[in-house]
């Protein structure tokens, strides 16, 4: 990589970092769908990974995780202990598992999105729609990576505590997890796929000029 490209990538990474931070702490990180607010904070991570590569994707995901850690530590809600080891809500407190939930899925968002994008491009070689389909698949895959890993890690590491804190439940906790994945995760993945296609294609055109 020449110096010019390296500088360009660092500037783009800084812009994506700024977007993630702004979206994490303002309403810009959410799109109202009527029945829910779709989280789109992970979209800059996905797009950054596609444009800059998996290493930058992992870095941007780490920034997303750090904003989540800070927010859940300093602006806690009843279930913030699953995202921060520094939070204790009544009889429930966070631990090392909280850091795993907060950081690992977010770091993997960009890495998964990048390799899905490249894999679909290769699989559809020769198709006029290959880039559009690959971008949509990367957006959906990156979003679902976050949702599926976060919610399943919550269940395996804090199942009973999360059920009690969130819904006052001691049984049927995984049904709640599945409900959240279906009601929140799937619409968010669709939105992420649409935004990834629209924004990344526009960025590709700008970068070619």
Language model segments and positions:
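Loop-helix junctions at membrane interfaces
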Residues: 1-209
């Amino acid at each position: 990589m020449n110096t010019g490209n390296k500088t360009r990538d660092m500037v783009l990474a800084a812009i994506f970092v700024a977007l993630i931070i702004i979206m994490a702490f303002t309403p810009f990180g959410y799109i109202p769908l009527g029945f829910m607010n779709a989280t789109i904070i992970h979209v800059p991570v996905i797009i950054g990974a596609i444009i800059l590569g998996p290493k930058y994707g992992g870095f941007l995901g780490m920034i997303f995780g750090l904003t989540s850690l800070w927010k859940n530590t300093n602006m806690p809600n009843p279930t913030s202990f699953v995202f921060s080891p520094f939070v204790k809500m009544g009889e429930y407190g966070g631990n090392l598992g909280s850091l795993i939930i907060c950081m690992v899925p977010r770091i993997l968002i960009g890495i998964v999105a990048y390799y899905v994008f490249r894999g679909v491009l290769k699989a559809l070689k020769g198709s006029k729609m290959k880039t559009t389909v690959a971008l949509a698949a990367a957006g959906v895959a990156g979003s679902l990576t976050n949702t599926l890993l976060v919610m399943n890690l919550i269940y395996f590491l804090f199942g009973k505590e999360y059920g009690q804190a969130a819904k006052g439940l001691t049984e049927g906790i995984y049904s709640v997890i599945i409900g959240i994945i279906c009601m929140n995760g799937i619409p968010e993945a669709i939105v992420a796929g649409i935004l990834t296609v629209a924004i990344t294609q526009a960025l590709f055109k700008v970068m070619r000029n």
